[in-house]
Amino acid sequence: MDQAKLARLQQSVRIGKGKGTPRRKTKKVHKSSGTDDKKLQTSLKKLNVQPIQAIEEVNMFKEDGNVIHFAAPKVHASVPSNTFAIYGNGEDKELTELVPGILNQLGPDSLASLRKLAESYQSMQKGEGGEDAKKDDDDDDDEIPDLVEGENFESKVE
């Protein structure tokens, strides 16, 4: 072979240089919550759930003492399959935020946690009240002299 032919062949061979084949774009599938809701709806239809009307609020009590509170939710139920579906925006709230209107909904476990909360608040208030009382007493003591037998402080005050 001729050296000139070899040089031309070497230049024509592309290894790592040039564009080559274009990169293939993959189609990204975005999974939306709408598809999840549709799947949930179809599985609930299989259970033959019925909507329950006139429910003002739903409260779910957690073990840590907090409550998941749903205001004006949509509720569907299937009593034979013991399935309840609650739709709406749930908010995590502390038990103390809902206390006046929630007392009739509390079970024995929740009542125990409510008692614990009440006791902890009382102990905190007593601790703060005791410290405040001591501080107030110390402030008042600066103006009042200590009583010592045999001395008359009336002349010093005037």
UniProtKB/Swiss-Prot annotation:
Keyword field contains Metal-binding: no
Originating species: Ajellomyces capsulatus (strain NAm1 / WU24) (Darling's disease fungus)
Subunit comment: Part of the nascent polypeptide-associated complex (NAC), consisting of EGD2 and EGD1. NAC associates with ribosomes via EGD1.
Biased segments, Basic residues type: 16-31
Known function: Component of the nascent polypeptide-associated complex (NAC), a dynamic component of the ribosomal exit tunnel, protecting the emerging polypeptides from interaction with other cytoplasmic proteins to ensure appropriate nascent protein targeting. The NAC complex also promotes mitochondrial protein import by enhancing productive ribosome interactions with the outer mitochondrial membrane and blocks the inappropriate interaction of ribosomes translating non-secretory nascent polypeptides with translocation sites in the membrane of the endoplasmic reticulum.
Entry-linked InterPro entries: BTF3 (IPR039370), NAC_A/B_dom_sf (IPR038187), Nas_poly-pep-assoc_cplx_dom (IPR002715)
Domain called NAC-A/B: residue spans: 34-99
Example GO BP: protein transport
Keyword Protein transport belongs to the record: yes
Keywords of the record: Cytoplasm, Nucleus, Protein transport, Repressor, Transcription, Transcription regulation, Transport
Disordered: annotated span: 1-40, 119-158
UniProt similarity note: Belongs to the NAC-beta family.
Compartments, record wording: Cytoplasm; Nucleus
The name this protein goes by in its record: Nascent polypeptide-associated complex subunit beta
Compositional bias annotation for Acidic residues: 137-152
GO cellular component terms listed in the entry, alphabetical order: cytoplasm; nucleus
